[in-house]
């Protein structure tokens, strides 16, 4: 498992809103943001370069972020939505929502693998099928990514959702019990097995004749 890394960024409060004010902010190197909690939205602005660095570091919906809000102190949040300009790679607006300790939320958790599957060394093909899952859990048990060790997977083996080692508070929101990773036989391996079986068949027939 991979514990959530807390990213930090300063937020300057703003009282003026609207299209013109947002454009003015962007031209000065700031990006408008909203902090949502208990049905109330607080308007603010963050440094564009710092925000872009944080976003490009690979944050997810499950990434815990600590905002240092002007006049309000530190607030822990998650990203609700990142809006971008469609024609250029630039952030337009970000919505954050406040963390409420003990209150369950629904978010997405990435699944990563570590190690080299044993079966892939003997002709099998490793497949990573599910890369992300939706989870309902409390903020205290959130992980940025779920890492599973596939070292012991041999040809024909697989890891299903029900076999994942996750915190007790997690409710994985998915239908059935699908396969997350597996090691399957390649066409070459299947062909080799068929050829071996055909080669053994005449020998078996001769052995049976000799017994008569």
Curated annotation (Swiss-Prot):
Q: Name one GO biological process term.
A: translation
Q: Which InterPro entries match?
A: Rbsml_bL25/Gln-tRNA_synth_N, Ribosomal_bL25/Gln-tRNA_synth, Ribosomal_bL25_b-dom, Ribosomal_bL25_C, Ribosomal_bL25_long, Ribosomal_L25_dom, Ribosomal_uL5_bac-type
Query: What keywords is this UniProt entry annotated with?
Result: Ribonucleoprotein, Ribosomal protein, RNA-binding, rRNA-binding
**GO molecular function terms here?**
5S rRNA binding; structural constituent of ribosome
Q: Where is this region: Disordered?
A: 1-25
Q: Which residues cross the membrane?
A: none
Q: Give the intrachain disulfide bonds.
A: none
Looking at the UniProt record for this protein, which Gene Ontology cellular component terms does it annotate, in alphabetical order?
cytosolic large ribosomal subunit
> Could you tell me which SUPFAM superfamilies the record lists for this protein?
Ribosomal protein L25-like
Composition-biased stretches (Basic and acidic residues): 13-24
Q: Tell me the function of this protein.
A: This is one of the proteins that binds to the 5S RNA in the ribosome where it forms part of the central protuberance.
Its family? Answer: Belongs to the bacterial ribosomal protein bL25 family. CTC subfamily.
Assembly and interaction partners:
Part of the 50S ribosomal subunit; part of the 5S rRNA/L5/L18/L25 subcomplex. Contacts the 5S rRNA. Binds to the 5S rRNA independently of L5 and L18.
* Entry-linked HAMAP family: Ribosomal_bL25_CTC
Report the protein name in the record: Large ribosomal subunit protein bL25
């Amino acid at each position: 498992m991979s514990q959530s890394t807390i990213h930090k960024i300063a937020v300057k409060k703003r009282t003026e809103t609207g299209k013109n004010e947002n454009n003015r902010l962007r031209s000065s190197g700031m990006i408008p943001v909203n902090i949502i909690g208990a049905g109330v939205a607080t308007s603010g602005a963050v440094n564009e370069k710092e925000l872009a660095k944080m976003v490009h570091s690979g944050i997810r919906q499950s990434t815990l972020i600590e905002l240092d809000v002007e006049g309000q102190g530190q607030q822990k949040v998650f990203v609700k939505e990142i809006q971008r300009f469609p024609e250029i790679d630039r952030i337009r607006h970000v919505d954050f929502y406040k963390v409420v300790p003990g209150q369950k939320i629904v978010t997405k958790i990435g699944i990563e693998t570590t190690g080299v599957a044993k079966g892939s060394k003997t002709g099998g093909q490793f497949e990573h099928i599910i890369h992300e899952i939706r989870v309902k859990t409390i903020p205290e048990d959130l992980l940025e990514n779920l890492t599973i060790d596939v070292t012991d997977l041999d040809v024909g083996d697989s890891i299903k959702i029900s076999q994942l080692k996750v915190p007790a508070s997690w409710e994985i929101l998915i239908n059935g019990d699908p396969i997350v990773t597996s090691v399957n036989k390649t066409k070459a391996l299947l062909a080799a097995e068929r050829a071996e079986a055909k080669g053994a068949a005449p020998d078996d027939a001769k052995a049976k004749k000799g017994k008569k």
